[in-house]
Amino acid sequence: MSSGLAGSTRADLESIRAVAGDALAFTAGLDEGGVAALPQADRRTFRALKNALAEIGELVSRLPPDLRARYPEVDWRGWAGLRDVDSFGRFGPELPRLHPAMAEELPVLVAAVTAELARAGAERGNGPAQPQSPDR
């Protein structure tokens, strides 16, 4: 590929974007208190959110350093660290940071991922996907 974006990296970026959308949907309409109450109030949503964030952490940890360097506004290390927090079951101390991460930091991550996917598409000369005609 002329863009230098390997297929696995592209897949990881697309997965980050999809899983981030899920995580945002899980917390839609919740304020800081609502997010902090999730472990007791809605364990299913809390576990789904935890799993989504751990998945994002794993995916972020696999991204190449040069890609991460292009987006210094993203706390790549912090996102990658979420996989470790979840894998060791120590998510409790992170609860106070959860709402700010979801409200402020996740949109920054998604914007960087979206920009990188667009950049790779532009380098390949493939702008955004075009709709297929019905007669194909």
Model-assigned labels for residue ranges:
Residues 1-136:
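Solvent-exposed interaction patches of small proteins and small membrane subunits
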